[in-house]
């Protein structure tokens, strides 16, 4: 790397493998498992032979095989059933020639090929349903046949049970219908009562509004009468103003008509 390359810093924590958490015995999961009898070093799984004793690790899936295919290959049904190698049948035939069992091995391989073709894409697997458990005889491997008398008795009992059930259903339906009718009547009564109550409230509000309107009209009339009386009692401001002005005009005229008064105003002396 030259000096022009980008610098990348790597920082490692104090515990990169997280051993502090795995060795911590005070956490909830560790104490919870110890209550059920688990101890450090024991595995977790369905069977003690296939249980995991180490931590769960991430594995990279670098093939196009479906999930669980590798585990299925490990489960061998017989010495020929192993799908890990493509040319295993040829190898088995070579071993058969060396051991002198070529015919048995070839027959087994042929049956396996036929089974693969049958169980291929269009293969059909028959699965017995749990419904046939009562009619299936495991000793004779055949279906059980019951007599007609038993069937008739069962049919008669079933018919009686059905009649009783029908009567009970009818009675219950009648009771439900009656309850439904009562419930409807109660609802109608409640609606009527609510409507009457609303009407009564509306009438009370209307009467209150009318009384308020009458009171406001009376107060307006009385206020108008009082204002008219007060206006009649107010003196004429215009007349008083004119009387004062007329007095002032008279005094001014008298001063102008008097020569002595004019001389005093203009500060004229006779000397």
From Swiss-Prot:
**What Gene Ontology molecular function terms does this protein carry?**
enzyme activator activity; nucleic acid binding; telomerase inhibitor activity
Composition-biased stretches, type Acidic residues, lie in 157-168
The G-patch domain covers which part of the protein? 25-72
> Where is this chain primarily localised?
nucleus
Domain of life of the source: Eukaryota
Task: Identify residues that carry Phosphoserine.
Answer: 230
Question: Where in the sequence does UniProt note compositional bias of the Basic residues kind?
Answer: 175-203
Q: Does the keyword Nucleus apply?
A: yes
Q: Does the keyword Transmembrane apply?
A: no
Give GO cellular component annotations, separated by semicolons: nucleolus; nucleoplasm; small-subunit processome
| Matches recorded under InterPro entries | G_patch_dom, PINX1
Q: Look up the coiled coil feature and give its residue ranges.
A: none
Per UniProt, the keywords (alphabetical) are: Nucleus, Phosphoprotein, Ribosome biogenesis, rRNA processing
Q: Where is the composition biased (Basic and acidic residues)?
A: 204-221
One of the protein's GO biological processes: box C/D sno(s)RNA 3'-end processing
Q: Pfam families, from UniProt?
A: G-patch
Subunit field text: Interacts with EST2.
Q: Which family does it belong to?
A: Belongs to the PINX1 family.
What does the function comment of this entry state?
Answer: Involved in rRNA-processing at A0, A1 and A2 sites through its action in U18 and U24 snoRNA 3'-end final trimming. Negative regulator of telomerase through competition for binding to EST2 with TLC1.
| Other observations noted | Present with 3850 molecules/cell in log phase SD medium.
Return the PANTHER family for the record. G PATCH DOMAIN CONTAINING PROTEIN, PROTEIN PXR1
Name of this chain's protein: Protein PXR1
- Naturally occurring in which organism (per UniProt): Saccharomyces cerevisiae (strain ATCC 204508 / S288c)
Name the gene for this chain: PXR1
